[in-house]
Amino acid sequence: MNKKALLLIAALLVAVTATAQTSSRWGVTLGANFNEVHFKQTDILPSEKMFGPQAGVTGEMNFGSSGFGVDGALLYTLKQGKVNYGDRVAWKSLGYGEETVAMHYIDVPLHLKFKYRRLGGAETTIMPLVFVGPQFSFLPYASHKSLNSYPPVNVYLDMGAGVELFERMQVRAGYNFSVGQSFHTKLLDDNVAKNRTWYLTLPWFLK
């Protein structure tokens, strides 16, 4: 799926929201991610997965009693990966070894969501949900800019599942991956890296 397709999905989500009978609410969210910096040429630069935090504000709109809705968020996310530049003479000769590449993102995910509400009354206690949609990630700061070149905006495909508890708190597990490059190395500029990220978040809605 390319960037144009994800932009089209985002536009459709906005259009549906504008025309549907909806109820909305807002809240805050906290979470953590486990990120892999995946290189196109994996034999050149080995990497290790790393944890990072994420936090921000979130909102959702539900379309009546259908179970369908949309949600979005504004998040700070730190995505990291440990890259062993010292495995190659080109970087080792410059004094680099095992380096932690840190990317500080402002994320804007937009999801189409479905909650299964027909649980005979139990849905007020626990309600399963699934979601999918694009995520737009803006990069105000990244480490090791002498080694890597970073695009200012990344587009991801984001998906996941979870449960809503007591109509207030959600527990979500998800996965997203970069559609384009997250960065490429300057010495070998065809060595493209993409973020592949598992995450767990805990949104808490204020009403």
Residue ranges and their predicted role:
Residues 28-32, 53-61, 74-76, 108-116, ...:
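Residues on the lipid-exposed face of transmembrane beta-strands in outer-membrane beta-barrel proteins
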